[in-house]
Each structure stands twice: as structure tokens, then as C-alpha cells.
Design a protein with these regions (language model features):
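Long, charged/polar, surface-exposed segments that mediate recognition or autoinhibition
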Residues: 93-132
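Sec-dependent signal peptide cleavage junction
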Residues: 17-71
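Short, solvent-exposed loop/turn elements at beta->coil junctions and helix N-caps
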Residues: 133-139
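Bacterial Sec-dependent N-terminal signal peptides
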Residues: 1-24
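Short, ordered coil/turn segments that flank beta-strands lining enzyme active or ligand-binding pockets
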Residues: 17, 96, 125, 154, ...
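N-terminal trafficking/processing presequences and adjacent post-cleavage segments
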Residues: 21-36, 87-108
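A short, surface-exposed beta-strand/turn
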Residues: 91-102, 159-173
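Exposed beta-strand-loop-beta-strand "reactive/processing" segments of non-cytosolic proteins
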Residues: 51-92, 141-161
Length: 173
């Protein structure tokens, strides 16, 4: 009987010790924050990264978030930062105080969200997506444009569609 109680106590202590192990969960580098706010003199710059499924989009936005404008903007009414990579570009405009005014992003041949793919194939059965572009524009922390421009083809017919990330077809029907 003493042996049974000893074994139960030993197992109980072992389980409680493992339950108290603290694991540090770090932010993975491929996860961007929902909102990036930077101090620009007396103003604040706001940038909203997109949670796009394409790795190239997230990498470009990560580079932009990590970019430090420093004092380069001094002496200019507007200062433009251009980041380019293979089939992608990001253009950011800063004012004379270093505040982020506008960001325009364009990506070609990106991985499309499931909602966009399902919506297009449901609305256009038998058609194939042959080309796509992702456009993302924001000004002063407000998203102005977030859309996919698609080219679809069936036999010799070609159509151009504009699709919202939630799958809503905006134009081209």
C-alpha cells in the first residue's frame, strides 16, 4: 500500500512539474504586426501591413517596416522611398517632417487567397486564371485600394476581372 501511494505521489509531482514549464513564444519574423506606428517628429506615421498568403508580399512589407528613413527627408517637400524586387514594388511617400503620407504596392503573379480562387471558379466555370496582380494602396493609415486584377481565359476568350480579397467580384462580369 505504501508503494502504491509512493508511485502515485511520484507521478503526480512529475506531471505538475512539467505543467509549469514556461515556453517563450516569440514573434516569428514572417508575422507582421497588424499596425505599425512610427514617430515622425510631432506626428505619427501609420502603416497597415496586409496579411497576404504570398511570401513575397510579406517579405516586401517586412523590409519596408524595417526601413529607417533617418534624416534623409530633411530639405525636401516630399521624400519617396522605392523598394523593388522580382515582380513586386512598393513606393512610399513621406512629407517634409518625415511622416508617411502614402504607400502604393504592386505585386505580379502572387499566391491568391482561397476566397478569390473559389469566387472566380464558381462564377466562371471552365475558365482558367492566367495572370494576376495584387494592388494595395493606403494613405494616412487608411486603406484606399486592396484588390486583385485577374486575367482569365477560356479557349480564345479572355476576360479581365477586379476581385476584392474577400472574393467579391467588383468589375469585369
Amino acid at each position: 500500500m505504501k508503494i502504491v501511494f509512493s508511485i502515485v505521489a511520484l507521478v503526480g509531482f512529475t506531471l505538475t512539474l512539467n505543467a509549469q514549464t514556461i515556453q517563450d513564444e516569440e514573434l516569428r519574423p514572417d508575422e507582421l504586426p497588424a499596425v505599425v506606428i512610427k514617430n515622425a517628429g510631432k506626428d505619427f506615421s501609420v502603416y497597415l501591413p496586409d496579411r497576404n498568403p504570398d511570401v513575397r508580399v510579406r517579405q516586401m512589407q517586412d523590409k519596408f517596416v524595417g526601413y529607417n528613413i533617418g534624416k534623409d527627408f530633411e530639405g525636401h517637400d516630399e521624400y519617396i522611398v522605392l523598394l523593388e524586387a522580382d515582380e513586386s514594388s512598393l513606393v512610399a511617400t513621406y512629407n517634409d517632417t518625415g511622416k508617411l503620407i502614402r504607400v502604393v504596392e504592386k505585386y505580379d503573379n502572387v499566391k491568391l487567397p482561397r476566397s478569390v480562387i473559389f469566387s472566380v471558379y464558381k462564377s466562371f466555370p471552365g475558365w482558367v486564371i492566367v495572370k494576376d496582380k495584387f494592388l494595395y494602396t493606403q494613405a494616412d493609415g487608411d486603406i484606399l485600394k486592396k484588390q486583385y486584377n485577374l486575367k482569365i481565359k477560356k479557349d480564345n476568350d479572355v476576360k479581365r476581372l477586379v476581385v476584392h480579397p474577400n472574393g467579391e467580384i467588383i468589375a469585369g462580369i
